[in-house]
Amino acid sequence: MQNTWKDIVKDFPTTPFLFVGSGLTRRYFDLPNWEELLKHFAAIISDDSFIFQRYMQENDKDYEKIGSAISKDFDSKWFRDASIRTNEEDVYAAVEAGVSPFKAELAHFIKINSIKNEAYAEEIALLQKLTENNISGFITTNYDTFIEDIAAGYKTYNSQEELIFSPIQEMAEIFKIHGSVTDPASIVITAEDYQEFNDKCAYLAAKLLTIFMEYPIIFIGYSITDNDIQKILSAIIACLSKKNVDKLQNRFIFVKRNAAITDDIKIGTYSKEINGQDIFMTQLETNNFKLIYEPLTEKQAAMPVKLLRFFKDQFYNFTLTNQPSKHIFVNAFDPNVPLDQLCCSIGQNSQLVKRGLVGMSLEQCYKAIVFDNIIPFSADDILAFAIPNLLSQTSKLPLGRLQVQIEQDLSSNYISGIHLIKKSVEQFIRSVVA
């Protein structure tokens, strides 16, 4: 094993994904955990100090079943007793749309209590900085919007279903597999919700498999025995051979909060049997998460991850539809051209596209001018960039159409306060060819 956390990060093949649990939300937002959240809503149903203990006993201390019982009782009381309703538009709108009042109120409760803990301001700022160039993406079971708040520009998938049915780029993305407060209906909290989640877990695992095999995964804010982690890992392990399972050891990093360690990181190995196979992962123990984040600044993507995702998304859509967009221009090329002679240019489209006009063929020019073929160039652009090169090949170019277009554009000698001097097309051509 490497000597330090910095050494481990240095050996990462790429920037990591962070798998974020409720522990991070508790740390930075001081929000309640699962049990505390259920207790809060149980207390709204009844002022009996033993109400939650009753739910615990009647449901075998199973939080999923307790969630179902509280949801049923809360919804019933919410419709009968207006005094327990939160008089806010987002709550009423959600209920009117068919969302359970329990989930609508829960989402609102988390929203209004999501206040950053200033004691961890430096940690939060450092983590936010990492989202620019040092983290590939996030996977989380949290409902709150902490990650979206710090990772501006990331694409967010607000539910397991949305993730399963969407093309993902594995870059600058947030996968909220248990739902989000921005969509209360998506929140997974009852036994029925979890059953539906488990039924689709194999599909989710298939969607995440490439990420788990190609990216380092840092689990943070979870207990190592967390059921959510166990279920997802179990579904993923079921897809892998022992050889590939063994590869996960160097890619799985588990951060364990240890209140006694404040100025160092204790590095060890943790093993867990899943599906009959021993899974090993690197374990980091500390209560100073700055020590976790700082070495990650040394592992950078080639360019900001938001841009990388944008490019991947554009190429994916073009490959899928064969339709260029305002962000991607694809010129016809000989399929027999060696790959090492092809290039991809990235830059401001207004400049790159005009440079591409220099290589316009005669056929393309005729189509653009005579048939108004759809090309996003002005007559000025064609004259300035394409015509000089084409005139060296032939003098028979249909320039009249360009002249008409230019004269229409210059119908006034003044545009935006700038005095324009009219010239004939012939004069313009002579000036650009000279």
Where is each model-derived feature located?
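Conserved catalytic-core helix/loop/strand module for nucleotide-ribose chemistry
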Residues: 1-189, 213-215, 224-227, 232, ...
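Active-site glycine-rich loop that binds ribose-phosphate moieties when present
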Residues: 122, 192-207
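Short acidic alpha-helix that forms the nucleotide-activated donor recognition element
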Residues: 210
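Active-site loops and adjacent core secondary-structure elements that bind or stabilize anionic groups
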Residues: 221
